[in-house]
Curated annotation (Swiss-Prot):
Transmembrane feature ranges: 16-34
Pfam families for this protein: ATP1G1_PLM_MAT8
Similarity remark: Belongs to the FXYD family.
Function as written in the Swiss-Prot or TrEMBL entry: May be involved in forming the receptor site for cardiac glycoside binding or may modulate the transport function of the sodium ATPase.
Membrane-protein topology: Single-pass type III membrane protein
PANTHER family found in the cross-reference section: SODIUM/POTASSIUM-TRANSPORTING ATPASE SUBUNIT GAMMA, SODIUM_POTASSIUM-TRANSPORTING ATPASE SUBUNIT GAMMA
InterPro entries attached to this UniProt entry: ATNG, FXYD_motif, Ion-transport_regulator_FXYD
GO cellular component: membrane
GO terms (BP aspect): potassium ion transport; regulation of monoatomic ion transport; sodium ion transport
UniProt name for this protein: Sodium/potassium-transporting ATPase subunit gamma
GO molecular function: sodium channel regulator activity
Amino acid sequence: ENEDPFYYDYETVRNGGLIFAALAFIVGLVIILSKRFRCGAKKKHRQIPEDGL
């Protein structure tokens, strides 16, 4: 029935694209949040030595 080489099952293509987009979004959030928490945990207040003023 589907002898045309340019026939696409658009429902499958759409579902695959939505899954890919959702995974890319989640991975991006994880990367952003991990960088934010890592940088926030390591950030220390720099103490200025009193004799240096």
